[in-house]
């Protein structure tokens, strides 16, 4: 399933209007992903069919733009440390693999491993888009942490 399809599915899902905190967190990483979301590429694919769905999507979906992998790690660490912060049922991470593909080396691998561990330790359901190639290092790290944590 693609990012747009999954977000559309979450927007169309049954929202309880008495819920006070956001239900979905979308984390957008890197300039390319940010431009896609901000310049309307995403809006063309994700639409709401009802007024209630539109209101719910505005109130229940939070979007965070981050420029570096280390900022994602800091943000995830803060999310876990906040006991009374917003609780999300779903976290969609968009652009992580593209952002990490620009740099190689042990530092980047270590940081990616830390980020994946933090993501998969969240009580929320975390999904990564687009999915990494199955034989790539990020995909193997993702399978490793998924096996260890879940």
Curated annotation (Swiss-Prot):
Function: Plays a role in a RAD51/RAD54-dependent homologous recombination repair (HRR) pathway to repair MMS-induced lesions during S-phase.
Keyword ATP-binding attached: no
Gene it is expressed from: SHU1
Keywords: DNA damage, DNA recombination, DNA repair, Nucleus
Protein name stated in the entry: Suppressor of HU sensitivity involved in recombination protein 1
A GO cellular component annotation in the UniProt record: nucleolus
Taxonomic path: Eukaryota, Fungi, Dikarya, Ascomycota, Saccharomycotina
Known partners and oligomeric status: Component of the SHU complex composed of at least CSM2, PSY3, SHU1 and SHU2.
Location(s) in or outside the cell: Nucleus
Main localization, broad class: nucleus
One GO term (biological process): error-free postreplication DNA repair
Keyword DNA repair tagged: yes
